[in-house]
From Swiss-Prot:
Presence of keyword RNA-binding: yes
Record NCBIfam families: PRK00010.1
An MF annotation (GO) of this entry: structural constituent of ribosome
Function: This is one of the proteins that bind and probably mediate the attachment of the 5S RNA into the large ribosomal subunit, where it forms part of the central protuberance. In the 70S ribosome it contacts protein S13 of the 30S subunit (bridge B1b), connecting the 2 subunits; this bridge is implicated in subunit movement. Contacts the P site tRNA; the 5S rRNA and some of its associated proteins might help stabilize positioning of ribosome-bound tRNAs.
Gene source species: Methylobacillus flagellatus (strain ATCC 51484 / DSM 6875 / VKM B-1610 / KT)
UniProt gene name: rplE
Protein name in the entry: Large ribosomal subunit protein uL5
HAMAP family in UniProt: Ribosomal_uL5_B
């Protein structure tokens, strides 16, 4: 079992029940899924760019990536309906906790000029979005073998009803929030 999953069951649940006074253990917020999304607008001109982006995302997540396609045509961006414009991976259960562990302990500390992650990136429904500017913060990506620096969006979906509960949950997992 993943280290953070054990930590959640043993420590985080008790801590959140004390803090918010839940009547049942099932009321305690938990992380439902983590979605990694990489928008690759340059893929319209060059198909190789998309292949490299998918390969990078698969290395980071340890799971097969799905190519996302444009929902409608936009002339300004030279995109037609059905063109590949990005890729995504949805992590759940064990893979999710293992990725979260790597993100907190290894990847986030490798961000240049890091001063903590923004506490303002909650969506009002208990979900958190984190933008990463360079995929090289993940140890799975070898700096010499990348063709371009690409950013990605990490969405952490929780069962929390409010942002306050979600922040308490992520803080319990030792997320380095800015004060």
């Amino acid at each position: 079992m993943a280290r953070l999953k054990d930590f959640y069951k043993d420590t985080v649940v008790k801590q959140l029940v004390e803090q918010f006074g839940y009547k049942s253990v099932m009321e305690v917020p938990r992380i439902e899924k983590i979605t990694l999304n990489m928008g690759v607008g340059e893929a319209v001109a060059d198909k190789k760019v998309m292949e490299n982006a998918v390969a990078d995302l698969e290395k980071i997540a340890g799971q097969k990536a799905v190519v996302t396609k444009a929902k409608k045509s936009i002339a300004g961006f030279k995109i037609r309906d059905g063109y590949p414009v990005g890729c995504k991976v949805t992590l759940r259960r064990e893979h999710m906790y293992e990725f979260l562990d790597r993100l907190i302990t290894v990847a986030i500390p490798r961000i240049r000029d890091f001063r903590g992650i923004s506490p303002k990136s909650f969506d009002g429904r208990g979900n958190y979005n984190l933008g990463v500017r360079e995929q090289i913060i993940f140890p799975e990506i070898e700096y010499d073998k990348i063709d371009a620096l690409r950013g990605l969006n990490i969405t952490i979906t929780t069962t929390a009803k409010t942002d306050e509960e979600a922040r308490a949950l992520l803080s319990a997992f030792s997320f380095p929030f800015r004060n």
